[in-house]
Amino acid sequence: MSGIIPPLVTPLKDNDTLDVEGLERLIEHLIAGGVHGLFILGTTGEEQSLSYHLRHEMIRETCRINNGRLPVLVCITDTSIVESIRMAEIAADCGASGVVSAPPYYFAPGQPELAEFYEDLVPQLPLPVFLYNMPSHVKVSFAPATVLRIAQNPRVVGFKDSSANAVYFQSVMHVMKCRPDFAMLVGPEEMTAEAVLMGAHGGINGGANMFPRLYVDMYNAAKAGDLETLKRLQPIIMQISTTIYTIGQHGSSYLKGFKCALPILGICDDFVHNAHFK
């Protein structure tokens, strides 16, 4: 898995109704923009605010609309291992390519507990697994040695890092050099170009919901070592980060930015789940 894999916004009509038509427009917009995969129900997709019914519908409708054109990754993060397994089973039944899992986020586990959690979870999942490092939201970060331990299972195939810590990301890349097949993906788009230049496999970049071709061009330039093109594109990406993502005064500001921009592009409504209204 490599390239630009947007973390899809979940188009909503209300707190428990999926905007299926908006989702279809969004997926077609992304495919036309040349992205390399689709990632649903992550942070940008408001997963933790959505009912299980709505999460399951999002999996089914995304896979139906995509119809095998791109790999689909499904986030199964939950405080309940039973619900994580159930989402993975639905994803497999619908034709998804893999699942993505951040640590359980209520009782923060220590590193031994974290490794044991995944050593229990991964064998019960029907799809390949990407680990998801999101310390700002789940209160714990995967130590590089923990990533290496968990990845002894070959069904753990990649790592998405949203820490925005370049030194940490390089440390994980270093310990995982024994697995050249292990996909290293970065979340923050502001640092995707430099990460790819240093050997990362791609980005799960929210801005690609709005401007997929921009992020694909950035990835291609970084992959090719085209610094002149990157010097032109990186300021545009930073302008998006420092304007669209600053709507409101809270941690969900970037999400509100997406949901303000996508209606302007004619893609979906601006409904944000009640948990993020303010």
Segments the model singles out, each with a brief description of its role:
Residues 5-9, 33-35, 200, 211-278:
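C-terminal alpha-helical cap/extension of soluble enzyme domains
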Residues 6, 40, 45-48, 78, ...:
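Short, flexible micro-motifs
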Residues 23, 55, 59, 84, ...:
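A general structural signal for well-ordered alpha-helical segments in protein cores
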Residues 93-99, 124-127, 149-158, 269-270:
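Structural recognition of alpha->loop->beta junctions
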Residues 123-124, 135-241:
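Catalytic alpha/beta core domains of metabolic enzymes, predominantly
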